[in-house]
């Protein structure tokens, strides 16, 4: 029984150490289809490689939060880092600017990544 207790203790200690690990998210902003002015599309913000899991993601239009946004379930990779996809339907045009704003413990201030329609 003593070996079992020792192994259980080691597992618990290693799991508690995961909370101390912090990885900044990688942020990718892209449209589902190539951008065409006046043609409906989907704006995606893929946030990956972050730890811990607490994160706030907003899609922005001209600097203002878009309210009707959906997202995937929080998932994790083999290395225990997390990833999410936030998306919304939008119709691009020449004047509007779109971006993704992410708040995470690894950032001192929220990070905003603009959508590049040519990507």
Curated annotation (Swiss-Prot):
Look up keyword Signal and say if it applies: yes
- Cystine crosslinks: 45-100
Q: Has UniProt tagged this entry with the keyword Signal?
A: yes
Signal sequence annotation: 1-20
User: Per UniProt, what is one Pfam family of this protein?
Assistant: C1-set
Picking any one GO biological process from the record gives:
immune response
Location comes to:
Secreted
CDD domains in UniProt: IgC1_beta2m
Identify the InterPro entries for this entry: B2Microglobulin, Ig-like_dom, Ig-like_dom_sf, Ig-like_fold, Ig/MHC_CS, Ig_C1-set, MHC/Immunoglobulin
Instruction: Tell me the ranges covered by the Ig-like C1-type domain, including all copies.
Output: 25-114
Mind listing the UniProt keywords for this protein, alphabetically? Disulfide bond, Immunity, Immunoglobulin domain, MHC I, Secreted, Signal
Location (main, coarse): secreted
Its cellular-component GO annotations read: extracellular region; MHC class I protein complex
Q: Which SUPFAM superfamilies match?
A: Immunoglobulin
Its assembly, as annotated, is:
Heterodimer of an alpha chain and a beta chain. Beta-2-microglobulin is the beta-chain of major histocompatibility complex class I molecules.
The text of the family note is:
Belongs to the beta-2-microglobulin family.
State the function annotated in the UniProt record: Component of the class I major histocompatibility complex (MHC). Involved in the presentation of peptide antigens to the immune system.
Could you identify this protein by its name? Beta-2-microglobulin
């Amino acid at each position: 029984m003593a070996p079992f207790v020792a192994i259980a203790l080691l597992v618990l200690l290693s799991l508690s150490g995961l909370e101390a690990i912090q990885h900044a998210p990688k942020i990718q902003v892209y449209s589902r289809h190539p951008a065409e002015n006046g043609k409906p599309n989907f704006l995606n913000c893929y946030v990956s490689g972050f730890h811990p899991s607490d994160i706030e993601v907003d899609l922005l239009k001209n600097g203002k939060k878009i309210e009707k946004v959906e997202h995937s379930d929080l998932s994790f990779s083999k290395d225990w880092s997390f990833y999410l996809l936030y998306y919304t339907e939008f119709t691009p045009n020449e004047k509007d600017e779109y971006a993704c704003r992410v708040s995470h413990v690894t950032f001192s201030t929220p990070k905003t990544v603009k959508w590049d329609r040519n990507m």
